[in-house]
Every structure is written in C-alpha cells, then in structure tokens.
C-alpha cells in the first residue's frame, strides 16, 4: 500500500501536466470561407473533416447561385478541390457538419466508446459512419503484445497442461476441463448438448444451469477429441485473455481513437487484476471477446438504416455469448444501461433510432435460446436459485493490490477478497487518481461523464449490502441492498459488479490519450503555418509529444497492476489403470465410484475420465451446481450425498479404520444400486489404508489391478 501511494505521487504530478496540456484552449482553425471554428475531432482524421467541411461550403455556395438563377446545385461530395486522390471518406450529413461548426472544442462530441451513438443519429443513405479500420503491421504488433502478456500470465502452465493445474482456483480448472470434455463427448455421441450424465450418474448435470461454456466447448470439440480437454482449456484461457484485449482494441479503433490510446485501453480490459484472477479457473469470465463486438453492433444501429441485417447479426452474437457466459452478458447490459441513462440526460442517444434493430436482435436471440433457457430453468436437474454468502468487495479492495500483481503482499491481498478467483477490484491508487483527473479535465464530454458515473456505480454495487472496510462492517448500507432480491440478479455475486468498471476505466484512459495526441497534432499544424523550414522528423516528434506523455502517465498508473504468472501445482497422478485399457474390463455401462467420492474439493476423478477416452464412463457424484432435493428446488454445489458417500467422507477425514454395522452395509449396498455402480475404485496412494480396510468391512476384500484397488459390485443389482 505504501509503495502504491509513493508511486501515485509521480502519477499525480504527470497527470497534472497532462491536464494542463489538454485544458489549453486550441487555436482557431481557418476554414475555406475565412471564418473560424473550434474543431474537435470525433473519430475522423483532420483531413477528412476538412474535406467534408469544404464540400459542404461548396454545396452551400452553389445552391446560393442556383437560388439566384446563376447555376445548378452541387451534390455533397462534389467539391472541385477534392480530387479523389485521398482515401474515400464516409458521407457526413449536413446536420452533422453544421453541428460541428456551431460548437466549441469543450462542447464537442466525445471521441470514444459511445462516439457513434453520441453524434448525429442516422447517416444518410444507410452508410456506416464508423471509420473503417485497415489493419496493418502496427495493429498486429499490438495483438502480439497481448498474446505475449497472456503467455506471461499462463507461463507456469506452458508444457504442463496435463501434469499441472491452476491450484489457486481450487478445483475450478479441472471442472472446466470436464465441461469441455462433456461437450466433446456429446458431439461425438450425438447426445443432448445441454445435458450430461458423465458425472452425478444417473441423475446427471444440467449444463445450461452450470457455467459449462458450451459456446466454446462445442465448436472446439474436434480439438478436445484430438488433443484432450487439458489443451482446450489452455487454448481458451490464452486466446480468451488476448482475444478480449484485442476485441476492445478493435472496438476503440472503430470509434476512431489513435492506436496508442486503443492499445492501452485494450490492455487494461484484457489484463486487469479481475481478469487475471478469473484466469485461475473461470474461462467463462476470461473469454469476453464478444462483448465489445456486441456493443459495436448496438452502436451501428444509430449509424445506418440496415436495421434488419444489423439486428439479426446482433441477435446471433448475443445468442453465442449466452452459450459462453450469461453472467458477463448481464453485467455488460447493466453497464450499457447506466451509460445510456447518462447519455439520454445529455440528449446524445436516439432510442427511437435504435429500437427497431434492438427489437429484431432480441427476437432472433429469443427464438434461438427459448428452448435452452426453458431447459435451464425447468429441464432435468434444473434449480431455481442458489444461496451465496455475502459476497461484496471490501472497500479497501477497490484501491488495493491483487494477489497476482507485481510487488504485492499476497496475504494482505487475500484478506480483502473471497478467494483467489474473485479478486474483482484491486485497481490500485494511481489508476483511480488518474481516472479522477481525466474526469475533471474532460468533464464536458458526455461520454467521459458516463464512464465516470459507470465506474462509481459499478464499484458501489460491488460492495454488497453493507460497506466493509478491511474486514470490519461500517454499518453503512451499500447500493446492492436495493437490488439483491430481484429475479436473476439474486444469483449474481455482487463482487463481480466491479468488473463493469474495467472497460469504463479503460475508456477514460483511452479517451485522454487520444485527446492528448489530437491536441498536440492541432498545435503542431498551427506551428507549421508559421515555420515552413521545420524538418518533417522534428515536426512529427513535436506533434506527438503530448500523446506519448499521456501514454507514459497511463503506464505509470498501470504499473502497480502488472500481472505476475499464475500459480501452478502438480496434479495427482492418474492411475495407470485409467491411462491404459484395464478400466475397460471393469466398466459395463454403469458408473464408477471413485473413493473418496468426487466433490468440490476433490475432483481428481475428472482426470481419470479425461484420460480414459474422454468421459467414456460416468462417475458417482461430482462438482457441479444442481437441485438440493427440497420442494423449493433451490440450488447447491455438488450432489445430495447418500449415506455411503457421507461415511466415506468421514473415514477419509478421520483417516482411521471404521467398521460398518450390518444396517450400514444394507444401506450402502442400496446406495450402490441407486448409483448403478459397476466398480468401486480406490487408488493406491498415501493414507489409503484406512479407506481400504474400512471398505473391506462393507464390500469384502478388493482385487489389486495395476495401481488401484477395485471392487466389482455389479452383482448387487441382480
């Protein structure tokens, strides 16, 4: 904390300098008519704005002549001074140009995330007014940097995808590998893609009611079947982190921001502490690359009149995201709602223009997901809601340091969060200071106000029902207390609302950097008019100085949240009984009971299944979310344990011989029949003697096959 505070001092000083640069009044720029206007770039290069205004002047002059009977009207874009040698530019409506000429720089439309929706709504002729981005080598370098950062985060897993696991996620790593395996098994066997009986046999698991990422598992099924679920998990994590950053970079470039600004914003969205934290075992919260694409498609609805096509594409994208992760989509929708309300206050959002496309998108998506959603809430093994203990962020976590960040104290960080996969805040002091300066300096931009409000509201929601400071309740109610019992929202962990602040803060940084580059560019051009002898290299350096200073300030603010590699520990070895073909002689269509039974803290049997021909046999119980067996159909983690499972759990915990009574033996045999168990398997490892000897009192002496003890219990079902 002290180190972060010390670092915040130079950040604050540099931010003050940057604020002075950005707040300087820009020099007037002369138009072709001799009048002056204060130009604020809104996603267009200066040359394109000048050309558009010149064409507008020509049209006005020609039409004046026509009114006097001295000439014919001139179409927009036919200005004789424009010879067409430059790259073609989008048509700019006259209303847009007129609005630009009647505004000051401070009042001009923002050039960032919501630029498309905050400019004049509806391009003429249905033409897309977002700048078309031609990707070049510089863009590929940015994406390569994102891939390199993702490799750095996962570096301890490289070369150990099947022998190591992300241990700070407890068993989440294995759980998601199992989900990828289940999707591949369903594809290979033409089974229901929304259900699997490969764990919790014979009841099975409702995949739609779990974070099963079928939207990635199904298309990646060939990879899983060819190389295994371990490889699929690594690929999804790697491309999820890098792809999310690259998608936001693309989104910001689509809004017209310069490359350095978009690169910094994209990096923060892809590698914020929350993203790195979820990389410990939550690929559904790592693979967020569709969210900026969906947002871009929403903004396109304000730019052109192809509502049907854009609406259909929007619906398809939303549908895909639902199958990847519903909760991230819900969080984005809340963020869009907050930003939209602020823009509506400023009258910078035309809901009537967007409504047809949004309605079409909603209809397409609802048509495609109606049955899956019915299955999720009313199908086999569905449940209503699941109880979570208070899961709000500690207030100190908002400016604290995450576990996997450079120079942090892991124990101090751990004390401020639920667990290592839910460090959803931890933005650091310097980033908050810089964001505050940006909001103050650029406060007249509606999009800056909207992003600032979004960051505050998201973090306020993330505090839960009551503000807690360093583990001590303050008695101050938080915003979440107003919404925690609403349908759907009741299942959301409030700590995750802080993730909505990530793109908000990234947008603020990107807008400020872009403004710095454009501010220095305009001043450089003004200087060129009075200094014709200036060398091109010196001029280019001078024009971009403020922009690179802004990048440096942002880098200083991001330094405390630079990620370190995730912790990887060795997996328990898979018995050769499963890596070879021996298991086939003991599996005959029923289940295998792993001892101790699989649950949220011991999912080693998942590795057995994945090693044996990708879930070729089902197992008893498991790690999933399912119904609790009560009339209210509430949810719970894992299966409702039968007496035999509870007994094995107690024996394993006590590590002492326990002799079963006659009544217990009868009950345990009934449990095995209910599970339709073929074989009970106990691997040979340390501390198995108590379990083995206790099982002897229930099932008799086992057979030793390679490196496991096995009991054939098929006879109990006859």
Explain the meaning of each model-derived region.
Residues 148-244, 272-288, 395-412, 469-471, ...:
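Membrane-interface coil-to-helix junctions
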Residues 552-718:
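Extracytoplasmic
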Residues 90, 94-96, 106-111, 118-157, ...:
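Start-transfer (signal-anchor) and selected internal transmembrane alpha helices
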Residues 167-186, 354-357, 361-439, 485-498:
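Periplasmic/ER-lumenal interhelical loops and adjacent helix-loop junctions
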Residues 146, 237-255, 260-345, 357-373, ...:
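Membrane-embedded helix bundles of polyisoprenyl
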Residues 346-358, 435-477, 524-534, 540-544:
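Membrane-interface helix-loop-helix junctions at transmembrane boundaries of multi-pass membrane enzymes
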Residues 166, 278-285, 415-416, 423, ...:
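Membrane-helix boundary/interfacial segments in multi-pass membrane proteins
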């Amino acid at each position: 904390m002290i180190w972060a505070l010390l670092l915040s001092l130079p950040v604050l000083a540099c931010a003050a300098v940057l604020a002075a640069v950005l707040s300087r009044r820009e020099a007037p720029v002369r138009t072709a008519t001799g009048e002056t206007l204060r130009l604020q770039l809104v996603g267009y290069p200066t040359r394109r704005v000048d050309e558009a205004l010149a064409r507008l002047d020509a049209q006005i002059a020609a039409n004046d002549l026509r009114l006097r009977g001295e000439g014919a009207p001139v179409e927009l874009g036919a200005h004789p001074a424009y010879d067409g040698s430059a790259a073609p530019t989008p048509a700019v409506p006259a209303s847009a140009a007129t609005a630009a000429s009647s505004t000051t720089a401070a009042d001009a439309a923002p050039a960032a995330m919501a630029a498309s929706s905050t400019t004049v709504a509806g391009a003429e002729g249905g033409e897309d007014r977002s700048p078309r981005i031609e990707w070049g080598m510089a863009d590929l370098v940015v994406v390569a940097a994102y891939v390199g950062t993702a490799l750095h985060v996962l570096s301890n897993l490289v070369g150990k995808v099947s022998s190591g696991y992300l241990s700070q996620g407890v068993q989440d790593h294995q759980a998601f590998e199992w989900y990828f395996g289940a999707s591949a098994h369903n594809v290979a066997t033409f089974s229901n893609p929304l259900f699997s009986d490969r764990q919790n046999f014979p009841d099975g698991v409702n995949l739609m009611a779990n974070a099963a990422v079928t939207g990635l598992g199904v298309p990646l099924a060939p990879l899983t079947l060819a190389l295994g679920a371990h490889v699929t998990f690594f690929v999804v994590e790697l491309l999820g982190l890098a792809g999310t950053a690259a998608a936001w970079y693309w989104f910001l470039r689509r809004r017209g921001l310069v490359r350095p600004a978009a690169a910094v914003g994209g990096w923060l969205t892809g590698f914020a502490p929350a993203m790195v934290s979820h990389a410990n075992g939550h690929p559904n919260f790592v693979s967020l690359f569709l969210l900026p694409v969906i947002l871009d498609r929403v903004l396109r609805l304000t730019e052109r009149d192809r509502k049907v096509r854009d609406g259909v594409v929007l619906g398809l994208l939303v549908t895909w995201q639902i199958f990847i992760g519903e909760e991230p989509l819900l969080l984005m929708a809340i963020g869009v709602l907050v930003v939209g309300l602020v823009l509506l206050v400023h009258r910078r959002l035309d809901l009537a223009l967007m409504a047809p496309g949004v309605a079409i998108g909603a209809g397409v998506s609802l048509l495609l997901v109606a049955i899956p959603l019915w299955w999720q809430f009313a199908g086999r093994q569905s449940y209503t809601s699941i109880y979570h203990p208070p899961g709000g962020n500690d207030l100190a976590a908002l400016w604290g340091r995450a576990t996997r960040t450079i120079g942090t104290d892991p124990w101090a960080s751990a004390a401020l969060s639920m667990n290592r996969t839910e460090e959803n805040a931890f933005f650091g002091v310097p980033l908050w200071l810089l964001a505050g300066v940006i909001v103050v300096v650029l406060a007249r931009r509606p999009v800056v106000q909207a992003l600032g409000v979004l960051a505050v509201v998201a973090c306020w929601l993330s505090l839960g029902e009551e503000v807690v400071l360093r583990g001590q309740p303050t008695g101050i109610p938080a915003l979440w207390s107003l919404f925690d019992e609403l349908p759907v929202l009741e299942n959301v962990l409030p700590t995750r609302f802080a993730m909505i602040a990530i793109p908000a803060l990234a947008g603020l940084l990107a807008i400020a950097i872009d403004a710095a580059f454009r501010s220095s560019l305009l001043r450089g051009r003004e200087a060129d008019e009075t200094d014709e002898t200036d060398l091109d290299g010196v001029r280019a350096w001078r024009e971009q100085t403020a922009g690179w200073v802004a990048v440096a300030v942002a880098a200083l603010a991001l330094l405390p949240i630079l990620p370190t590699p995730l912790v990887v520990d060795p997996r328990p070895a898979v018995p050769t009984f499963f890596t070879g073909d021996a298991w086939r002689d003991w599996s005959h269509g029923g289940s295998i009971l792993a001892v101790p039974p699989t649950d949220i803290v011991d999912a080693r049997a998942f590795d057995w299944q994945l090693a044996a021909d990708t879930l070729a046999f089902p197992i008893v119980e498991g790690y999933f979310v399912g119904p609790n067996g009560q009339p209210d159909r509430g949810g719970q983690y894992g299966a409702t344990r039968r007496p035999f499972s509870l007994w094995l759990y107690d024996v394993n915990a006590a590590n002492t011989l326990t002799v079963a009574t006659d009544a217990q033996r009868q009950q345990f045999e009934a449990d095995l029949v209910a599970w339709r168990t073929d074989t009970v398997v106990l691997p040979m490892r340390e501390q198995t003697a108590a379990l083995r000897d206790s099982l002897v009192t229930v099932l008799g002496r086992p057979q030793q096959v390679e490196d496991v003890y096995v009991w054939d219990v098929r006879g109990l079902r006859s």
